[in-house]
Amino acid sequence: MPIRYEVLADALAGALQECLGILAREVDLRELAVFGLYTSGELNYLGPTAETKSRWPSLPFQWSPADWVFHGIAQDAFKEVDALLLEGWRDGCDTFDVDAERLVPLIVSILADVRRRAFTGTDVLVGLFVAGGHRWTDQSVEMINPPKVALRYR
């Protein structure tokens, strides 16, 4: 069965909202340096990730989301997202069939909405962070954030 992108969009928006609520109980959201979603180059999973401004300067690899203090926070909120993405597996899980030209803009649009609602007026950088680095990360950071904030990623 192909991925149901409209259903995925709603599930992802809800998961991110729940994630932000959980994260806000742990830290003042204005104290974050970065917030976003982490994935593979196949886009076969999406997980929340965030790091604080206080820890940012001491990180040996600042752009390694797996090292961020809030990597994977509220992952349970993404169960429906995970299930919907699993629909993209074909041929006994040998092939992951995703329309990246459709999915990446969908994710970026939802993250841009999150930035408007939760981080307007802050310097929190929001993005789609892809394992191993990827043009999607660069594109998402530029599309989601004000130019001054996006410059921090370069």
Residue ranges and their predicted role:
Residues 1-27, 31, 54, 64-72, ...:
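Acidic, proline/glycine-rich low-complexity IDRs
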Residues 47-94:
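Structured domain cores in non-transmembrane regions
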Residues 26-57:
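N-terminal interaction modules that seed assembly of large macromolecular complexes
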